[in-house]
Design a protein with these regions (language model features):
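Catalytic alpha/beta core domains of metabolic enzymes, predominantly
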Residues: 128-132, 142-252
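Active-site beta->alpha loop and helix N-cap motifs at the rims of alpha/beta catalytic domains
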Residues: 2-147
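C-terminal alpha-helical cap/extension of soluble enzyme domains
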Residues: 8-12, 36, 207, 214-296
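A general structural signal for well-ordered alpha-helical segments in protein cores
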Residues: 26, 62, 88, 124, ...
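Short, electropositive alpha-helical surface patch
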Residues: 60-68, 92-102, 155-164, 227, ...
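Short secondary-structure transition/capping segments
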Residues: 53-55, 115-118, 179-180, 204, ...
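Soluble or luminal CAZymes and related metallo-dependent hydrolases
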Residues: 25, 57, 119, 123, ...
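Short secondary-structure capping/turn micro-motifs that flank functional sites
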Residues: 49-50, 111-112, 175, 200, ...
């Protein structure tokens, strides 16, 4: 069982102008992540526009990433976008056969109507019985279609089951991260914070890395913060402020703004998104300059 920790980018999905997955561009993007020193890759997630990918595309995407990474870092993926439990089971079983190192369950699909713990446990226990017993699992408090945070009891149940190796924590709340780190002690479950504003204090509190959207802009800086920040605390504090303020740019048309960023880097050719059809450079005045400043 591979550990999932460190800097874990939520991968973009490059598309061609005619709305097909740009696999040559994706291969270059994978190379870029690896050169930046990432510790794992989250291949099919919200940043990947998974809600706008067919099941065939999601499976092919995960398999492609696994093949191109060639074991250099762990690859995790989610990809269940249905509320219906039978459809979720089908989606997750297909994803489990792609060669990924951990299969990530989206918490809002374990409780689609926000009915509470009874529904959550019923869905979760069904999946635990039907998914391969030797497949490491993860949890992801994905913000869409709604952010379904785990209660402490639900979190502890998952941690103590021994099946779960990673939680992408989207609480965006340092006390919650601190509490979960304590609850997970003695279990395989690593908490990885996804909120840039608390990235550094969360790491200091025991978050095993970072998995926010700005891993698509400067994962190398997050890598330094996680792996070397403790040796230079003043520099780490200053860097954490820059990273926090930079991440506000997410609100200006993400993920299309990240694709424009990579288009300018030469990673891939098209900014095309399925989730965002806006001309974000016109909609958000000053975005073009901000993207250049982040790059520099």
């Amino acid at each position: 069982m591979k550990k999932i920790e460190g800097i874990v980018p939520v991968m973009l999905t490059p598309f061609t102008p005619d709305n097909q997955i740009d696999y040559p561009g994706l291969e270059k993007l994978i190379s870029w992540y690896l050169k930046e020193g990432v510790d794992a890759l989250f291949a099919v997630c919200q940043s990947s526009e998974m809600q706008y990918l067919s099941l065939e595309e999601r499976v092919e995407l995960a398999r492609f990433v696994v093949q191109k990474v060639e074991g250099r870092v762990p690859v995790i993926a989610s990809g269940h976008i249905s509320d219906d439990l039978a459809e979720q089971t089908k989606e997750l079983q297909a994803m489990a056969n792609t060669g990924i190192d951990a299969l990530v369950l989206v918490t809002n699909h374990l409780d689609p109507q926000n009915q509470g713990s009874e529904t959550f446990y019923a869905h979760l226990n069904h999946l635990l019985k039907t998914l391969p017993a030797d497949m490491p699992l993860g949890l992801y408090e994905c913000p869409a279609p709604y952010r379904r945070l785990l209660s402490d009891d639900e979190f502890s149940f998952c941690a103590n089951s021994g099946r779960f190796v990673v939680l992408k924590d989207v609480s965006c709340d340092l006390p919650t991260v601190e509490r979960r780190v304590k609850l997970a002690q003695g279990t395989p479950l690593a908490i990885i914070n996804a909120n840039a504003a608390i990235a550094w204090p969360a790491m200091q509190a025991g978050s095993k890395g970072f998995s926010g959207v700005f891993t698509n802009f400067h994962p190398g800086l997050y890598h330094w913060l996680y792996h070397h920040g403790a040796q230079q605390p003043e520099k780490a504090h200053e860097l954490s402020l820059f990273l926090s303020l930079s991440a506000v740019t997410e609100t200006l048309g993400y993920p299309k703004n990240a694709k424009i960023y990579h288009q300018r880097l030469g990673t891939f050719a098209s900014e095309h998104c399925r989730v965002n059809k806006d001309n974000v450079l016109e909609k958000f005045w000053g975005l073009s300059v901000l993207l250049d400043q982040i790059r520099d």
